[in-house]
Regions:
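Class II aminoacyl-tRNA synthetase catalytic cores and aaRS-like
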Residues: 1-279
Length: 279
């Protein structure tokens, strides 16, 4: 039994190594073609994903104000379907005549390729949004690059917002730029990141995969910002105090000890900030 488990784990590791090799080969091919994503240092972003949805909802409400919803009462299934389709196409034509152009950037977390058109989900700091990628809109070469891209790659997308037939606000891509190539494989999306040890040791993966963890960090950042603003408005001054000290006092806790090579002396991790603030 142990031998079977070891063989299975070895096979899985071999598969992972092969996938990692493929990703590095894709990067090498991009670099040889003069499309090294790591050479791109700036990309103009006009909106976050949540901003796009808010902007489109407001624009839609303005353009379609007073337009009643389609009434399918008394229609059979086929007639109702045609009425809903006609209403959608009319609404879409009104919105497309005065489109909302946006530019976003984020990590691709999902991709579904369907011949000449594809869908993907782009995730940024404030959420995620679906993008619609058509070969005729972005060109054959770029579409081929997109089809070869992997989950975890970071894309810049320029286009206009629209609402799909299912009601989801999306972006119709007109320009796309591969900003960064993901060389590592993200955990499987459905089950998420459940390994507690990995979540703490590789916090960056936790922030990518778990929305709840990211929200905690965002809230923490906002709280610290408000505390700083509150104190700064009252003429408090922020100062830095030493983190490594010769004598860690102020409490009975046992300090962490290490050796400072540059000074050739033993130091301790501080316990209390109060002692230095009082000096």
């Amino acid at each position: 039994m142990a031998g079977q488990n070891n063989g299975k784990q070895g096979g899985q590791q071999q598969d992972v190594n092969q996938l990692l090799k493929v990703r590095r080969e894709k990067l090498a091919n991009l670099q040889e073609a003069g499309q090294d994503p790591f050479q791109i240092t700036k990309y103009d972003v006009t909106h976050h994903t949540s901003d796009v949805k808010e902007l489109y909802n407001a624009h839609e409400e303005k353009l379609l104000a007073g337009r009643p919803a389609v009434n399918t009462d008394g229609m059979d299934e086929a007639a109702a379907r045609e009425a809903v389709k006609a209403d959608y196409e009319e609404r879409r034509s009104i919105m497309d005549a005065d489109p909302v152009h946006v530019s976003i950037a984020g990590r691709m977390m999902f991709k579904r390729v369907m011949g000449k058109a594809s869908f993907a989900n782009i995730q940024d700091l404030k959420g995620s949004i679906q993008i619609y990628v058509a070969r005729d809109a972005i060109g054959e070469d770029l579409y081929a690059t997109f089809k070869k891209s992997d989950i975890g790659d970071i894309w810049g997308v320029k286009g206009y917002a629209f609402r799909t037939k299912t009601g989801e606000i999306s972006i119709h891509a007109e320009e796309m730029t591969l900003l960064s190539k993901s060389l590592q494989i993200l955990p499987e999306k459905f089950h998420g990141l459940t390994d507690t040890d990995m979540r703490y040791r590789q916090r960056y993966i936790d922030l990518i995969m778990n929305q709840e963890s990211k929200e905690v960090f965002v809230k923490r950042s906002k709280i610290l910002k408000e505390i700083r603003n509150f104190l700064a408005d009252r003429d408090f001054m922020e100062v830095e105090t030493p983190m490594l000290v010769a004598n860690a006092g102020g409490a009975a806790a046992r300090p962490f000890e290490t050796h400072y090579n540059a000074l050739n002396e033993d130091v301790k991790l501080r316990i209390s900030l109060e002692l230095y603030l009082k000096r």
